[in-house]
Each structure stands twice: as C-alpha cells, then as structure tokens.
Amino acid sequence: MKVFSGTANQTLALAICKSIGCELGKINITPFPDGETFVKIEENVRGEDIFIIQPTSPPTNHNLMELFIIIDALRRASAMRITAVLPFYGYARQDRKDQPRVPITAKLVANLLVASGVNRVLTMDLHAQQIQGFFDIPVDHLYAAPVMYDYLKKKKLTDLVVVSPDAGGIKMAHAYSQTLNAELAIVAKRRKSATEVESMAVIGEIEGKNVLLVDDLTETAGTLTSAAAILKTKGAKSVMACVSHALLNDTGIERLRKSVIDELITTDTVQRPAIDGVNITTLSVAGLLGEAIKRIHSNSSVNSLFEFKGGRTS
C-alpha cells in the first residue's frame, strides 16, 4: 500500500499517514507558467494498492484537474488499484437538474473520475447522498459525526436543542439529536436566490436552550449566521455550529465575525489559513480516514466506521 497526496491538503495527508504508520509517497507536482500542471511519481508503484488524498475544494477546477493527472500518472505506472480519497467532494451541490438547460456536474465529476482510471472512491459527508449512485465503482461514504460527537460529549451540554438550518439538513440534525439525547428543531427558510434568503421561521422550542446548528458545509456562512440570528431572537441561550466542511470565503469569514455564533466546530477536510476574530475549533478526521484506508487495503469491512454512540450516522 502507498499513499500519495495532491497539493489541496497535504497537512491532512501527512496526518493520515501518521495515523496509518506509513510515509507519504514521493511525487513531484510542478505548475507551468501557462497554468498547466506537470506530475511525476518519484517511486515505483507497479502492482501497488494506491490511495490519493485530494479534497476537491477551492480552487475546485485546479484541484480536480490535478487529481485527474495524478491518477493518469499512477495508472500508466501500472498501479494495481487506485482509490481516490476525497475528504471533500467538489460540485456536490450541482446534483440535480433543478432548472432548464443546466448540467448535473456532480455526475460529470463521477464520470470523469471513473474515466481517469479510479477503482474506488472514499469520501466524507457528501452534500447529497445520492451522489454515491452516480458512480459505477465502489464508494465508501464516511461521516464526521463520530469525531464531532467525541468533542461535544466532553462539553457536557445541558438544555440542548439540535437545529437544522434548513429542511435539507433535517436527517443529519435528527442523527445528532438522537446521539446527544437532545431536542430537535428546524429553521425553515424561503429563498430569493442561491445567495439570498427572503424569510425564516423556527419550528421547535428554543427559548432558554443551548442550540447546536448542524450542517454539512458552509462557504458564505449566510445560512448559518441568519439561522443563528433568528434563534437568538427566539431566546436561545447560546448558539454553536457544527459544520463538516468549512470552506469559508471572505464573505463567510466577515459574516462569522459579526455573527452571534459562539463557536464554530469543523474538521480539517479542507485546508484554510488561521482566521482572526472567529472562535473556530478544528477537529481532525485523519484517524477516521486512516482507519478506512487500512480496512479497504486489507479488504475488511468499514461498516463500523459509520456507527457511534446512539446509532448509525446514515
């Protein structure tokens, strides 16, 4: 078994290798002045079981293309099996045709991964679970919930309500509420556009409660901060947010700085610089991904990785 990494999140890749007990594979990735990428595998991979760690986070197109080139290089070097480890799956929000003449880009990415020579995909907290069905190869879909739970249980939170910031996240919120033995609520919203919310309402009892907002990803933080604001007006004692993938562009960072969210709990699936003025706790999923890689390599079951106290995450 050998583990390689693109440039998207080498910090996570090194942590995964440490948890497995192996060295990160030697690879030369060089950008050309015209924007093209050159890749050379610097060690023998003939007959090897290969894992490539590359979240397709922003810059999404660059990281995707880099991944395809690495896969092609490994395939042409006679690797036995190639598993693409995508801690974050880019384009996951484009998972359906919701208006005329638009693509289903999440499916296109799946097609391109298979065409490039991948034999298996390992990913985490897909924005839309049906993306697993876009592939004609095995997909192992992990969840950050067990890592989040281990952190949250140490807080010994009382009067807790788990809140989904929209209708789409109710399944995730329900799993958290069952595990944490907490009440469940939802913020129902009506959108003007993909980036603008017209109105919001809270369904559930919030007054005097400690609130935990849960979501799979945030970029502009509009949904999170708007939900937190209305929860505070409804009498929430405190508001924390658990988000698996915190992509956080400049708009999102500024919104969080001005928000009433007391703590944002996220993971290291995507790499980002330190952010001043925002209370962010970053939990590592390196151990979880590392264990999955070991089990896939040994052809063992990964079923137990979907489970944590309170039941399954799926």
Task: List where the protein language model places each region.
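PRPP-associated nucleotide enzymes
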Residues: 1-314
